[in-house]
């Protein structure tokens, strides 16, 4: 999609969102040459702040190829925000409902029309204590295998310094630098002739996330952990510790009662 076809609603959103971004933040944008000039494609982006969709959208808007985000369906229900979401062609995600596959179909359709669909593969803000990308969901992998379109990894850093994950108190000053870096397409060709089994989807997802993490290492100038943070594993470990604590407490109580 060329800049001439961006449309009224996306231009309106840009008019509203760009001025505060320009005033509040400095920019360090790299890798724009990797954003395809034509044809449908996926961008896969790390997620570490509630405001990083705006900083990333600003980056890509300036390439002339606007992204279609997958966003929770509640944003499409009422008010001005719903009008903007619908008008800019964002894609609602209906989690755990009979409409859950609609987002997949809509993403595939958008790519086949020559548009860009932006995925946050982690599905939510990272829970990694040091804000590295964590284990991801398979949505981007599914669409990539279905369409065989280019998958552009994107790393971003800086919005999280202004508004950390799960924080409600922004710290805009001193001005932070929004760093965004796109990389070359992830080579997924070895998966194209395979059935999208859970194992294949997991491997494709890990390949995409490895590319994002490598870019973020370059942006941050430091090494990521060898193993991505796994929130499910962390929750299980917390439950095990809680269960051990409960068992220990019960044993000690029984010992006291028998005295």
Describe the residue ranges of each PLM region.
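A transmembrane-helix-recognition feature enriched in membrane-embedded lipid enzymes
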Residues: 1-31, 37, 79-88
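Catalytic core of membrane glycerolipid acyltransferases/transacylases, capturing the structured
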Residues: 36-97
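Hydrophobic/aromatic ligand-binding patch that stacks against planar heteroaromatic rings
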Residues: 59, 84, 109, 142-146
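A charged, well-structured terminal subsegment
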Residues: 105-109, 178-210, 214, 218
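Catalytic-site beta-strand/loop segments enriched in glycine and acidic/polar residues
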Residues: 110-140
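A cross-family acyltransferase "interaction/gating" segment
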Residues: 130-199, 229-235, 239-243, 247
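Short, flexible loop/turn segments with low-complexity composition
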Residues: 218-233
């Amino acid at each position: 999609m060329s800049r001439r076809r961006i449309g009224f609603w996306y231009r309106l959103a840009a008019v509203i969102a760009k001025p505060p971004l320009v005033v509040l933040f400095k920019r360090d944008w790299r890798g724009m040459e990797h954003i395809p000039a034509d044809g449908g494609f996926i961008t896969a982006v790390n997620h570490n702040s509630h405001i990083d969709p705006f900083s990333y959208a600003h980056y890509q808007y300036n390439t002339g190829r606007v992204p279609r985000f997958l966003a929770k369906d509640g944003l499409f229900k009422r008010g001005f925000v719903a009008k903007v979401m619908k008008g800019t062609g964002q894609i609602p995600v209906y989690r755990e409902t009979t409409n859950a596959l609609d987002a997949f179909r809509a993403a595939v359709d958008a790519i086949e029309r020559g548009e860009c669909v932006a995925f946050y593969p982690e599905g939510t803000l990272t829970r990694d204590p040091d804000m590295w990308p964590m284990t991801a969901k398979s949505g981007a992998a599914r669409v990539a295998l279905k369409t065989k379109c280019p998958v552009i990894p994107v790393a971003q850093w800086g919005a999280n310094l202004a508004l950390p994950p799960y924080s409600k108190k922004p710290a805009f000053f001193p001005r932070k630098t929004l760093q965004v870096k796109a990389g070359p397409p992830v080579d997924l060709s070895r998966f194209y002739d395979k059935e999208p089994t859970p194992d294949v989807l997991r491997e494709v997802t890990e390949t995409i996330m490895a590319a994002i993490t490598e870019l973020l290492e370059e942006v941050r100038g430091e090494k990521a952990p060898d193993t991505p943070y796994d929130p499910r594993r962390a929750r299980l470990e917390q439950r095990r510790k809680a269960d051990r604590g409960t068992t220990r407490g019960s044993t000690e109580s029984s010992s006291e009662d028998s005295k």
